[in-house]
Amino acid sequence: MSAHCMLTGARPGFGNRISHSHRRTSRRFDPNIQTKRYWLPSENRHVRLRLSTKGIRTVDSIGVEAAVARIRARGVRI
């Protein structure tokens, strides 16, 4: 599965791992993706969302209905 947030669109960042002697090798900074299950009252069912921790706080703030509407507006099928 891809490491990106369905709500915020957070994706991995890239950079360098730097050793003590300053040799550089590529590395990935993955977002903290969590799978959360929310109850969607309008559809009378649960939905499983892959969200970053910032996305989880956004759902807590705006509500699951508005969050699902934003995700669907991005073209993601739930």
UniProtKB/Swiss-Prot annotation:
One of its GO terms (cellular component) is ribonucleoprotein complex. It comes from the Bacteria. Transmembrane segments: none annotated. Gene3D superfamilies: Ribosomal protein L28/L24. InterPro entries: Ribosomal_bL28, Ribosomal_bL28/bL31-like_sf, Ribosomal_bL28_bact-type, Ribosomal_bL28_sf. The keyword Ribosomal protein applies. One of its GO terms (molecular function) is structural constituent of ribosome. GO terms for biological process: translation. Keywords: Ribonucleoprotein, Ribosomal protein. Belongs to the bacterial ribosomal protein bL28 family. This is Large ribosomal subunit protein bL28B. It comes from Streptomyces coelicolor (strain ATCC BAA-471 / A3(2) / M145). The lineage of its organism: Bacteria, Bacillati, Actinomycetota, Actinomycetes, Kitasatosporales.
